[in-house]
């Protein structure tokens, strides 16, 4: 409660909290009635980072843009506002990372960037994340940003993304095929395959 109270007292009245529970799709649907963008302001510790990582896909699935506010070196909004005031908090809102870039930066911190093998693994994970962005223009924008931020040639990263993208598209099509209603043609094909199996 204290974070929300502090933010409202500081003038940030469009602030809500999940009250200690995990952020849910129902909460995202409720937020969608009032806005298209949500700035996550969870605690800066490991639990807060995990909460943000869990919330971001839920926001996307419900048509909301998610950004993540950096609280460091403070633990939470209440502590930040008491130490630096409302202007500092507003500045951090303006500079909040996009959800996808936040996910990549969390990944960055999980790998030793000085070790060639570890850095290679990291870049492969970045490519996997980027390959999952369905909108081509959005994917290109993040590809350029990631290449600049993580100091890799854009062409090299793009080749990796394209490689993983083909696999991701295949998985999607395969999953859609599995879950699609069974047609007469599919029933015949399945029956034919069953007959051809060795006894």
Residue ranges and their predicted role:
Residues 1-3:
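Short, polar loop motifs at secondary-structure junctions
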Residues 5-13, 34:
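Alpha-helix C-terminal capping segments
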Residues 13-20, 158:
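Short hydrophobic/aromatic-enriched beta-strand-loop microsegments
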Residues 22-38, 42-199:
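A charged alpha-helical hairpin associated with nucleic-acid processing machineries
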């Amino acid at each position: 409660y204290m974070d929300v109270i502090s933010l409202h007292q500081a003038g940030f009245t469009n602030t809500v909290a999940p009250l200690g529970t995990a952020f849910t799709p129902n909460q995202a649907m409720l937020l969608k009635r009032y806005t298209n963008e949500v700035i996550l302001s969870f605690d800066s510790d490991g639990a807060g980072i995990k909460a943000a990582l869990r919330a971001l896909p839920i926001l996307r699935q419900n048509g909301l843009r998610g950004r993540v506010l950096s609280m460091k070196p403070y633990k939470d909004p209440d502590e930040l506002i008491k130490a630096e005031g409302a202007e500092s908090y507003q500045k951090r809102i303006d500079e909040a990372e996009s959800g996808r870039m936040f996910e990549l930066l969390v990944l960055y911190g999980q790998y030793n960037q000085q070790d060639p093998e570890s850095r290679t693994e990291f870049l492969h994970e970045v490519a996997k994340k980027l390959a999952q962005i369905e909108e081509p223009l959005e994917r290109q924008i993040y590809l350029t940003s990631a290449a600049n931020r993580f100091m890799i040639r854009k062409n090299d990263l793009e080749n990796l993304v394209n490689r993983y993208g083909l696999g991701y598209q295949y998985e999607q099509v395969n999953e859609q095929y599995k879950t699609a209603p069974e047609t007469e043609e599919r029933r015949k094909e399945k029956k034919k395959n069953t007959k051809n199996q060795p006894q």
